[in-house]
Amino acid sequence: MGKVVGFTGRILPQFDTGEMGKYVNTPETPIFVKSRVLYGLHKSKGAIRDQGKVLLVEGQMDCLMAHQAGIKNAVATSGTALTLDHLKLLKKLTDQLILNFDNDEAGIQAGERAIDLATANDFNVRVVRFAPGTYKDAAEAVQADPPGFLKLIEQAVPAIEFYFIRYLPSGHTSASGSSHILELKKGVRTVLGKIKNLSSSVE
């Protein structure tokens, strides 16, 4: 832990054709398996243990920016899915997980899978929410408003509340009549399925 196992590079804008992600990682090797590595853990484990919780972000830059803002308990999955190996590393330090993946549909879906996996393995999960159309990720939020990002972390909602907000949105909807009822029923079924999978007795 704390040794160099790989590198990440950013595609320069003038060479970005849109055919690949903005960041390129070292190919996996016997010593670099992304599903077993949490970026920043060697720097964060003391703060995680002291605070009794971990902030899990998606990218390395998210983690770096969080640390620069004084959020020393942040680690990143390096853009890959959260895995059981990741959770085993974290479980040695805490079972309190605060999740903040990217604020796009792909990031939100990855966050859902992370919630389901973590709660199934006895983690208490809370989710940091960005309002639609605001920040795309933790790095952008920290750069724009460090105190505001800290406040969002403090306001992280329980996993079940996140699912209610995502699948049973309040306010007006573009659907009406029977289509609105069908949409609502679908949302209720989804939330009930998520609740069934949550293992925390508190939730």
Predicted regions and their residues:
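Short secondary-structure boundary/capping segments
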Residues: 70-74, 114-117, 142-146
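Conserved acidic, small-residue-rich alpha-beta core segments centered on
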Residues: 98, 110-121
